[in-house]
Curated annotation (Swiss-Prot):
This is Periostin. Keywords: Cell adhesion, Disulfide bond, Extracellular matrix, Gamma-carboxyglutamic acid, Glycoprotein, Golgi apparatus, Heparin-binding, Repeat, Secreted, Signal. Residues 1-23 form the signal peptide. It comes from Mus musculus (Mouse). One of its GO terms (biological process) is regulation of Notch signaling pathway. The gene is Postn.
Amino acid sequence: MVPLLPLYALLLLFLCDINPANANSYYDKVLAHSRIRGRDQGPNVCALQQILGTKKKYFSSCKNWYQGAICGKKTTVLYECCPGYMRMEGMKGCPAVMPIDHVYGTLGIVGATTTQHYSDVSKLREEIEGKGSYTYFAPSNEAWENLDSDIRRGLENNVNVELLNALHSHMVNKRMLTKDLKHGMVIPSMYNNLGLFINHYPNGVVTVNCARVIHGNQIATNGVVHVIDRVLTQIGTSIQDFLEAEDDLSSFRAAAITSDLLESLGRDGHFTLFAPTNEAFEKLPRGVLERIMGDKVASEALMKYHILNTLQCSEAITGGAVFETMEGNTIEIGCEGDSISINGIKMVNKKDIVTKNGVIHLIDEVLIPDSAKQVIELAGKQQTTFTDLVAQLGLASSLKPDGEYTLLAPVNNAFSDDTLSMDQRLLKLILQNHILKVKVGLSDLYNGQILETIGGKQLRVFVYRTAICIENSCMVRGSKQGRNGAIHIFREIIQPAEKSLHDKLRQDKRFSIFLSLLEAADLKDLLTQPGDWTLFAPTNDAFKGMTSEERELLIGDKNALQNIILYHLTPGVYIGKGFEPGVTNILKTTQGSKIYLKGVNETLLVNELKSKESDIMTTNGVIHVVDKLLYPADIPVGNDQLLELLNKLIKYIQIKFVRGSTFKEIPMTVYTTKIITKVVEPKIKVIQGSLQPIIKTEGPAMTKIQIEGDPDFRLIKEGETVTEVIHGEPVIKKYTKIIDGVPVEITEKQTREERIITGPEIKYTRISTGGGETGETLQKFLQKEVSKVTKFIEGGDGHLFEDEEIKRLLQGDTPAKKIPANKRVQGPRRRSREGRSQ
């Protein structure tokens, strides 16, 4: 008896090794979960889920157990003995181990009696009862019943050859447990070494040539039996062979040839092909199909979008899953009962056509990837209002197939009734603000980026921790890139900024008190110059009850006033909807203290105060409206009267009082813009006329260059003003100017001057003079250079023609009278008595 102990120990070790709970394969992990769910029913009981109305059963995964459904269908829970165990009369659960027999006997133990019978009549029985080690993928009785009757009859009529070969094609010449069946493995069968494609999926499903293992790991003395849900058919063709032989796939075959992909489907691999039928192609608009087929890049993208680089059998799909296609984008494959859906649409009409390099599913819809679509075709159901308006107002036709564009598409509910009912010309301008001249993908956007629309407007990009915004509107998920452009989805209609912070406040009477205090604090320039600011602007309600004496008190302490006002201003542009909802965002104000912002239920809270209106865009920042005066809680007040005033206006916090304390003086930093002016010496060209020559002077040309980059900061003391000074050294050389045929010598003069630029931008002019019968020549010249016409007055300054003057010149009016060099005359010009034009 002693020698039996080591043998018994080895047997226990073997059984422990194959115990699903101790294995690491997906199948065994799901089996272990089913065992846990069934343990209340007794030892070695597994919980299975059966889809209602079918005979399909699955070991319970965690996900399916809690959902109570598989492929969207409700399931009922069954409790059965786990593989390798059996019940005993009068005892709970499955306390007994199944007897171990040879492979032939095990077929009967697992209930695969039809396979057992066919193994007997085909003379396979002797082989699987004898010596050896086999893996038998045995079709269930139901699988044989579902086999095509003609095929089954043919096997039964030739049991010694056809049936025997068919059964051998279900066998492998070694024992392989589910943990040995690796995903993507190809195992040679016992019939001509034809490959068996093994797939072992994360949800625990194991397939062989897309047949699902429904009862695995039935150990035999000379191998193992895995019961499968269908009969395996012999395969010897590739996906390419199948496409070339199927007449119903001729359109798809043509697309494969056009894109040079047909031959690649004949190579070794583990592909999944969703092949659209000819009927599917007939559903496409003819123009769309012709455009794609005429574009090799688009047709290649179309083909690759139908191919996966992994073998995906239908039986492995128990819920929605996302897969990457060869094209690079993803598709979602799901199931609804026995139907397979792609991107949420049931379209698979024939599944699991197994070939030697993959599997084919026939579909009745053509899958068009974004990369093969025109930019306007990228819009989804939530952007139909935008795309409909773009088409109705004639903008869609301007999006040329060979151009590149970016659509900034607001969602449907962003368009109010008032917007939709406005004048179509104005509505067209609004839509133009949502179309960019170039293709800009999501990954191309960065903070501070300037984008130009087809309407000529410039839009700013703001990138935050959890949001990307363009002007006042922030993106939602759904950005796509197509053949000639990209689309990004926005919550609201984008409103380009037109006015500065100061101009916005000035045109809104709600801010008149705050604006007056801001100007009294000498802070007006801060809101007029270029920059990026966020202003929390208090309305007049914030100062309700403040008397004129109290206002004078506040203005009288300039440091205090500046501290209070600058606490409402923070560097950077912060859009309300750009903040991560529900969390506090801490910003440092220009005054130096912190301000606390939070987005709650589409409302911006500023120091826990609700903003009455947010995201008012300006050219140098954004305004958020508050109806309370903001004050930094960490700054004490040392003046009794000021404290009384602040307590009168601010009731939501307790202001500290420290007698004698004063407000700090805040050094004001301003942006300075570098301007370089280049002066080019004038060139004189004499145009001969019939009576009077025309002097055409080009120059002096002045080029204004604005250098953008990091701002320069310098300290500006109180009372000091900032002036932009341009240094130049124009050189005027000696030349002769002919006026009415009389030569006038102008001596060479060289000077150095400083020009203080306080007015509008420098305009470039062209200098000319003439008159008499040379009007036709002058008129032609003016028509070409109508925006650059200047009349040169002898001894005086150049004069820029206004629009009305230009019109009169074009109509033949004569120039004005002579004007002294040291005097500029306003009003209409007249001819002098001498007849000399100026």
